[in-house]
Amino acid sequence: FSQQTIPPSAKYGGILTVTMSPGDGDGPELMLTVXXXXXSACVPVDFEEVVVSSNADEEDIRTSLDLYANVIHCKLGDGLFLQCCKNIANPTATLLASCMMLDHLK
């Protein structure tokens, strides 16, 4: 195991910036380990840390991280997506498709 201090040049576009949000509990310790492992392996990644706690307001987190989603909850669908998945998986022996109906929306 060799210890390099200068990461090798990346093949596609140089060093990538990755946002890391350690959170609460075990998160900070795990993220420290991830960052140390990535630095030891000379992975071309630069970590940008964003501090978020469980006490933070959801809207504040989404606004500060520029996260927006257009989510439409629907209980019933026509099954087209599932049928397309099954059609794609059918001729391929290595791809398996299964269906599970979940109803957790109010």
Swiss-Prot record:
Annotated compartments: Mitochondrion
Residue runs in coiled coils: none
GO terms, molecular function: enzyme activator activity; isocitrate dehydrogenase (NAD+) activity; magnesium ion binding
Main location: mitochondrion
Keywords: Mitochondrion, Tricarboxylic acid cycle
Mitochondrion as UniProt keyword: yes
Activity regulation, per record: The heterotetramer and the heterodimer composed of IDH3A and IDH3G subunits can be allosterically activated by citrate (CIT) or/and ADP, and the two activators can act independently or synergistically. The heterodimer composed of IDH3A and IDH3B subunits cannot be allosterically regulated and the allosteric regulation of the heterotetramer is through the IDH3G subunit and not the IDH3B subunit.
GO CC terms: mitochondrion
GO biological process, alphabetically ordered: isocitrate metabolic process; tricarboxylic acid cycle
Family (UniProt): Belongs to the isocitrate and isopropylmalate dehydrogenases family.
Subunit structure: Heterooligomer of subunits alpha (IDH3A), beta (IDH3B), and gamma (IDH3G) in the apparent ratio of 2:1:1. The heterodimer containing one IDH3A and one IDH3B subunit and the heterodimer containing one IDH3A and one IDH3G subunit assemble into a heterotetramer (which contains two subunits of IDH3A, one of IDH3B and one of IDH3G) and further into the heterooctamer.
Function: Regulatory subunit which plays a role in the allosteric regulation of the enzyme catalyzing the decarboxylation of isocitrate (ICT) into alpha-ketoglutarate. The heterodimer composed of the alpha (IDH3A) and beta (IDH3B) subunits and the heterodimer composed of the alpha (IDH3A) and gamma (IDH3G) subunits, have considerable basal activity but the full activity of the heterotetramer (containing two subunits of IDH3A, one of IDH3B and one of IDH3G) requires the assembly and cooperative function of both heterodimers.
Name listed for the protein in its UniProt record: Isocitrate dehydrogenase [NAD] subunit gamma, mitochondrial
Species this protein is from: Sus scrofa (Pig)
Lineage: Eukaryota, Metazoa, Chordata, Craniata, Vertebrata
Gene: IDH3G
